[in-house]
């Protein structure tokens, strides 16, 4: 290659590097971390504020194949004293963490969302080609079904507690199981290995990949969650 071409290539690489570094410094999580460190300093003093980690944080759970970076912004998860704070600086309810520590379960296995992402919109998952958005009030409002955050989050409980007749603290799932029993759904459908064969097996219908559903009759969003809402 002659010198002009090499010069152009070099200039392009320099500009690309500058843009990359600039974009990296503009991530939202840097501001959230600075705000949390400031709040810790105001509440507990400068010495404790200096112990707040900086940079990207990640919880890696090999058994679940999950790498969650949620605590990059939600740094107060295990801190006492921020129970009344706004998200993402709010303490997580401790009674749940005692039986579901993040080191074992991660974050997205219960909450949903895109664990790899570190900016709010992609992390919370209301983006194209991501089928597991955060299960919360915003999602309920988007689908016009319910504005109770717990009602949606408890869907994740059934992944592990599928065979429990009742799950402590999961009132919505318990009610749904009782409703299926009272309405006699097993007369036509197999659920957890028992039931009729007139209709399809419903045991793992919620675990199917998004492309396995038929969306022809859906008028709104073409997602697996929308399919379940419609049915």
Which residue stretches match the model-derived regions?
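N-terminal export/targeting leaders of redox proteins
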Residues: 1-98, 141-146
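Extracytoplasmic electron-transfer domains, predominantly the class I c-type cytochrome c fold
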Residues: 93-159, 164-170, 174, 178, ...
């Amino acid at each position: 290659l002659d010198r002009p071409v090499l010069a152009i290539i070099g200039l392009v690489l320099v500009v690309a590097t500058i843009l990359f570094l600039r974009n990296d410094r503009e991530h939202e999580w840097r501001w959230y971390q600075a705000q949390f460190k400031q709040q810790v300093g105001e509440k507990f003093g400068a010495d404790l504020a200096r112990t707040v980690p900086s940079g990207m944080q990640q919880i890696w759970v090999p058994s679940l194949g999950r790498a969650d970076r949620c605590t990059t912004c939600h740094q107060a998860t295990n801190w006492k004293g921020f129970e009344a704070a706004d998200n993402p600086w709010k303490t997580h309810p401790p009674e749940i963490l005692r039986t579901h520590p993040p080191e074992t379960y991660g974050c997205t296995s219960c909450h949903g969302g895109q664990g790899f992402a570190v900016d709010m919109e992609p992390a919370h998952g209301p983006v194209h080609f991501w089928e597991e958005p955060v299960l919360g009030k915003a999602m309920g409002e988007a689908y016009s079904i319910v504005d109770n955050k717990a009602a949606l989050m408890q869907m994740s409980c059934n992944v592990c507690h599928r065979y429990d007749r009742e799950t402590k603290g999961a009132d919505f799932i318990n009610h749904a199981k009782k409703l299926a029993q009272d309405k006699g759904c097993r007369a036509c459908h197999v659920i957890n290995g028992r039931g009729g064969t007139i209709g399809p097996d419903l045991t793992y219908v919620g675990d199917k990949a998004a492309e396995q559903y038929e969306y022809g009759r859906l008028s709104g969003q073409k997602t697996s969650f929308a399919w379940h809402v419609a049915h």
